[in-house]
Amino acid sequence: MTVHTTDTPSPDGDAPDRRSLHERIAADLRDEIMSGDLAPGAPLPSTAQLKARFEAANATIQKALQVLKDERLVVGRAGASVTVRDHRQRTVRPAAYLAPSAPGEPYRWLAEAAKLGARAQSTLLDVREVRPSADVAAALRLAEDETAVLRHQILSVDGEPVELVKSYYPTAVARGTAVAEKRKIRGGTPALLAELGFPPRLSTDRVSARVPTQEQYQALRLPTDLPVLRTLRVVYSDDDRPIEATVMVKAGHLYELQYDFVPE
């Protein structure tokens, strides 16, 4: 496969790829890693093979490989070939985390990560009343200028930050409860909300790819401006009442989401 360097549009009318050559090479190799064509632990083609395949100079190939190293997709050691990291991408099944944890059990996200042999941790960054963004306010059906209780945390796996989470709760639900206190909640907020009389009945996800904000870029230690996966999840209780709206942001090159469903 050859990466063309011309800016001339193709005959079918597609716009030219204006990225630098090393970025295009990294993009093709990244796709092969994430699709499994380059399996975990497998060596990447040699520099000579990549130079021939992409008609590129040695320095360009090295820049492309450095991009993949910075993204934690491959690892290189002196005197050895560059290989695909064992945990190149994690598949998340949102439905596995929605039910409240059993009494005394840890939050489901932590428990599910442990089942996969990963060391997961949540760090609570802030808890306070705020005016949420317009999409969150609409999801919670808040009046104009009405506030919500924000619980802001960052999730890490094996010491690496992987997800930035901002959960918002109507003050009528959260004010005066542990949800509004700056401390962790055993079993997570779903279990506490159920105890408070607001069991989760339905969750709706809206997933989009976004360019990371400055906050997201820094918190997730992103190596480049690769897109992030942004999920707006709205949780409803009895009588179709929204009780939680959560904005979750994951590094797009490290995660994929899996949804299981049947036709309506």
Positions of PLM-derived features:
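HTH-adjacent hinge/linker in prokaryotic transcriptional regulators
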Residues: T2-R24, A52-R53, K63-A139, A143-E144, ...
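C-terminal all-alpha effector/ligand-binding and dimerization domain
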Residues: D12, R119-E264
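Short helix->loop/beta-hairpin flanking segments within DNA-binding domains
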Residues: R24-A42
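A short alpha-helical element within helix-turn-helix/winged-helix DNA-binding domains
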Residues: G36, G41-E55, L68
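Residue-level "edge-of-site" marker
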Residues: P45-S46, A64, S81, D126, ...
